[in-house]
Amino acid sequence: ANCVKNGVKIILTSGRSRREAMDFQMAIGASPCIISSNGASAYDAECNREIYNERIEPDVLLGLIDYARRNGHTVKLNYGDSLIMNKAAYDDEKPLETSYDVLEHVAREEQVVQCVVNDTDFEKMKIFREYVKNEYNGLDIANESKRFKNPDLKPSKRYYCDVASDKVSKGHAVKAVCEYFGFTADEIITIGDGENDVSMFKQTPNSVAMGNALPMIKEKASFVTTSNDEDGVAKVLERLY
């Protein structure tokens, strides 16, 4: 709170949709600027202005929806400040449910920046993951369930892949936000704990990895703070004010 009062912008970067990220941003009192969908979108909520937006090509997106439909996967589409899906996994998602026809209409007509595909079946999602990698140029899995790369992890209730344009990264979005506000690389700090945060680290000499990050992530950052459980982000911000 002291940082925001003193003019420091605390900008949330999230794999969530803009709608979900803005709810979280308001809850924690961060600045009204959001990088969402793993960097596919950046938005200034104060001015209601799109800063950066990287759309998935409609034909490609329609192919993903068709594959998910044939294989019984759940599909979520992130666009603007909206989020829709064919099947809710949780009760609070019920109002977001819609038909495949509506999903296909949105794929054609809206600026969809991220398609989240998920399922309870780990093996089926492994096949989907390979399908995306082998069948589509111009697409990338921006984020995914950790068990895909570490099969020894405890099973989850659901497994997901966040699919976006291969031009998307949190680093690109951070760069766009810096240009928008007129920040230099020396004037920002980036903080993260995941593989998809490394691209942000490259945007500034002031990069910070969380204490709970994997060793390979910590090696990419200039500094390391304590873990999430030990208020690692707060400790970085306290050094500013």
What are these regions (language model features)?
Residues 67, 71-74, 78-191, 195-198, ...:
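Conserved acidic, metal-coordinating active-site core of Asp-based
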Residues 3, 14, 38, 115, ...:
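Residue-level signal for inorganic ion chemistry
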Residues 178-181, 237-241:
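Short, hydrophobic alpha-helical segments
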Residues 20-23, 127, 173, 199-200, ...:
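Phosphate- and divalent-cation-binding pockets in alpha/beta enzyme and binding domains
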Residues 1-93:
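Active-site phosphate-binding/coordination module
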Residues 39, 146-147, 211-215:
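Short, polar loop motifs at secondary-structure junctions
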Residues 28-30, 38, 46, 136, ...:
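Short, structured coil segments at secondary-structure junctions
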Residues 14, 174, 184-226:
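Acidic, Mg2+-coordinating phosphoryl-transfer loop and its flanking beta/alpha structural elements
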